[in-house]
């Protein structure tokens, strides 16, 4: 059986990942293709428990290395339990965040550097996205959208980080897009939902 397609979607909070994930699901469902949508951190019972630890505002003392290791543990569990089996069944898998999030957030945002990529490549083994959609949005606009939609009180531990952290993350994403142009496609997320969707669908058409 032919291996399925693996698509990840990346970007800062407020960039519209959840909305575009639903659009990608619809793209494949309309074609009668079986699709599995999941998220990081999370996606399995164990990974969701790790997610609650990572995003809990009370865990402000978490060290950058501990944060990196918990993210990679969550990812390893998701790959082994959900993503790899689905790809082996020939399904399309779309994941809200994947390895690039760790490289951007912990590698660039926390300043841990190349160690993050090495640890996470070990966690995922041979499973990497065929296409990564990076929703490119200035972090200040992303934060404004999140605050307008949910309010400041609902922001999680990472969302509450200072803006200089989020700009380091953003620079990390841009560096990744430049380093891996054959896999990562940047989509201008300052535009309308429909304009973004049209550009994403054009990229999905290219995967055929």
List PLM regions with ranges.
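Hydrophobic positions on the alpha1 helix immediately C-terminal to the Walker A/P-loop
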Residues: 20
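ATP-dependent small-molecule kinase phosphotransfer cores
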Residues: 31-124
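NTP-dependent small-molecule kinase module
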Residues: 23-25, 140-208
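A glycine- and Lys/Arg-enriched "phosphate-lid" helix/loop adjacent to the NTP-binding pocket
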Residues: 102-171
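Walker A (P-loop) phosphate-binding loop of P-loop NTPases
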Residues: 14
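Pre-Walker A (Motif I) flank of P-loop NTPase domains
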Residues: 2-6
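Hydrophobic anchor at the beta1->P-loop junction of P-loop NTPases
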Residues: 9
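Conserved lysine of the Walker
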Residues: 17
């Amino acid at each position: 059986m032919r291996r399925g397609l693996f698509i990840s979607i990346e970007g800062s909070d407020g960039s519209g990942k959840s909305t575009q994930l639903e659009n990608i699901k619809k793209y494949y469902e309309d074609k009668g293709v079986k699709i599995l949508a999941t998220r990081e951190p999370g996606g399995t019972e164990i990974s969701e428990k790790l997610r609650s630890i990572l995003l809990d505002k009370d865990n402000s003392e978490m060290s950058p290395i501990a944060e990196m290791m918990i993210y990679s543990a969550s990812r390893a569990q998701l790959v082994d339990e959900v993503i790899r089996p689905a790809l082996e069944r020939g399904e399309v898998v779309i994941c809200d965040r994947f390895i690039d999030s760790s490289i951007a957030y912990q590698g660039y945002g926390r300043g841990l550097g190349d160690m993050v990529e090495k640890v996470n490549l070990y966690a995922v083994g041979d499973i990497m996205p065929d296409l990564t959609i990076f929703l490119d949005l200035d972090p200040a606009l992303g934060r404004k959208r999140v605050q307008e939609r949910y309010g400041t009180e609902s922001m999680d531990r990472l969302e509450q980080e200072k803006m200089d952290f989020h700009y380091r993350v953003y620079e990390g994403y841009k560096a990744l897009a430049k380093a891996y142009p054959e896999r990562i496609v940047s989509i201008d997320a300052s535009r309308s939902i429909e304009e973004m969707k049209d550009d994403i669908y054009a990229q999905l058409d290219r995967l055929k």
